[in-house]
């Protein structure tokens, strides 16, 4: 993880810039395409192709080669799905002006996939928030970071097919939705397969599958963390990164999932006090959108001085000078977006607001409560946070709790403390009463972090082979909402040799 909160704009490399420019030129005649896969018309064929791929953990540490195995030998298969997705975004729930709070973005900019903020002449970078209001009794399936782990993704879809939730790529159960929490590529060798699978789900269920934008959904990240290299090895100069870059612009940085007047903030990173969703949550459409516009963190701090007071006294001057109003020009320019980057403390005794160099702001229990309270509308309330992002290759207190909690951790456990930071899983479960059962109680003001998929550096470094997804069932009142955690050992990891 790289940027500081205040981050000077870093020029995109010339080679990538040329690739992006060429790619956008190629999209000019893409309008009106209807997606249909000839190679993989059904999920079963796609599943079989992915099953032939070696695991990420088998490939880690091997000498670099000029070629990578892929289930998508021709980039055209991906490009066709991407262009169909663009049409779906343009003509679906984003199309009616009535679904946009504060005004619909310009067709010649936001919806013009032949232009981009990362090229000249640039169009504005326009991050946005989404509301997804579902009927009481609905199921919403959540998954955290994949980071190029196609085997865990396929295992999740297998599980949902076996449960009757999915029929292939199609959601078979009524009032069932899927929300993915960002970081789909980088740090793994099958990012393109993960993106393609997301697109297949989205195209089969355009109004029920949604993807949040993580910090790795950024054209400035992919040259550094592996996705660009992966695709160049698979497709050489046939790879079209501009299509990928524009896809990311249609992913909301935050999705407020709710029923009635109760909502959960669902995003990749953490809190962003510079955007308050009250007007969005009070809007009449069940699916609604709002551009973030100017991010007004400095204004929030002035109106809510208790947030700064919740910080350690030695950090307040720095925090006050760093949290300021700004207009976003790119995901990390001039400042990083908190929904994509920020984190949370592990223990309730830690400060309500802090900062970690290389990642961003860290919100504690009191600071989070302040922002959640301010996020309410006239009737709507934000009850908590579902997110991902906060993972490490190395064993640390957060990863210990994610693994001991069977892939889902509720921050600020009542019986946990800094004194038990490095406790074993057995101690965390017995003495700290760390939640690890399938059913989890939802508490007002709680923050939940989903683990990263296991066929990865993270799984290897922290010695786990199971993947996790959550099933949220909404109710007429927030007290009736239920959360179920599903774990499964990934088949390709069962026979890994020692050390992998």
Protein language model regions, located:
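N-terminal secretory signal peptides that target proteins for export/translocation
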Residues: 1-9
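Bacterial N-terminal signal peptides
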Residues: 13-23
């Amino acid at each position: 993880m790289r940027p500081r909160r205040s981050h000077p704009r870093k020029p995109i490399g010339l080679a990538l810039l040329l690739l992006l420019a060429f790619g956008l030129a190629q999209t000019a005649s893409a309008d009106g395409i209807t997606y249909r896969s000839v190679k993989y018309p059904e999920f079963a064929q796609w599943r079989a192709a992915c099953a032939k791929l070696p695991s990420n953990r088998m490939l880690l540490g091997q000498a670099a080669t000029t070629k990578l195995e892929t289930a998508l030998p021709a980039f055209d298969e991906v490009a066709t799905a991407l262009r169909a997705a663009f049409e779906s975004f343009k003509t679906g729930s984003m199309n009616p002006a009535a679904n946009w709070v504060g005004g619909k973005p310009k067709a010649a900019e936001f919806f013009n996939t032949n232009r981009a903020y990362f090229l000249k002449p640039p169009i504005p970078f326009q991050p946005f928030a989404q509301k997804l209001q579902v009927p009481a009794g609905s199921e919403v399936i959540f998954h955290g970071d994949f980071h190029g782990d196609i085997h865990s993704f396929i295992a999740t879809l297998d599980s949902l097919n076996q449960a009757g939730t999915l029929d292939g790529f199609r959601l078979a159960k009524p009032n069932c939705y899927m929300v993915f929490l960002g970081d789909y590529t980088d740090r793994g060798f099958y990012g393109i397969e993960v993106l393609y699978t997301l697109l297949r789900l989205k195209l089969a269920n355009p109004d029920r599958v949604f993807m949040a934008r993580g910090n790795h959904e950024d054209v400035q990240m992919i040259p550094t963390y592996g996705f660009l290299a992966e695709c160049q090895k698979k497709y050489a100069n046939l790879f079209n990164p501009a299509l990928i870059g524009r896809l990311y612009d249609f992913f909301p940085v935050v999705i407020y999932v709710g029923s009635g007047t109760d909502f959960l903030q669902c995003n990749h990173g953490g809190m962003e006090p510079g955007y308050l969703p009250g007007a969005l949550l009070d809007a009449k459409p069940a699916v609604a959108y709002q551009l973030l516009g100017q991010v007004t963190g400095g204004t929030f701090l002035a109106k809510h001085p208790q947030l700064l007071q919740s910080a350690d006294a030695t950090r307040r001057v720095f925090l006050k000078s760093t949290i300021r109003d700004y207009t976003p020009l790119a995901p990390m320019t001039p400042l990083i977006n908190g929904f994509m980057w920020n984190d949370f403390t592990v223990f309730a005794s830690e400060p309500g607001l802090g900062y970690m160099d290389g990642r961003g702001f860290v919100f504690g229990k009191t600071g989070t409560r302040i922002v959640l309270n301010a996020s309410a509308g006239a009737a709507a309330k934000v009850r908590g946070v579902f997110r991902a992002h906060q993972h490490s290759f190395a064993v640390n207190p957060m990863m210990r709790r994610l693994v001991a909690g069977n892939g889902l951790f509720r921050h600020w456990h009542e019986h946990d403390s800094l004194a038990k930071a490095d406790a074993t899983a057995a101690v965390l479960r017995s003495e700290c009463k760390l939640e690890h059962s399938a059913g989890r109680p939802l508490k007002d003001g709680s923050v939940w972090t989903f683990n990263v998929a296991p066929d990865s550096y993270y799984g290897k470094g922290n010695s786990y082979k199971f993947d996790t997804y959550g099933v949220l069932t909404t109710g007429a009142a927030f007290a009736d909402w239920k959360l179920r955690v599903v774990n499964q050992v990934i088949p390709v990891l069962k026979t890994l040799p020692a050390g992998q």
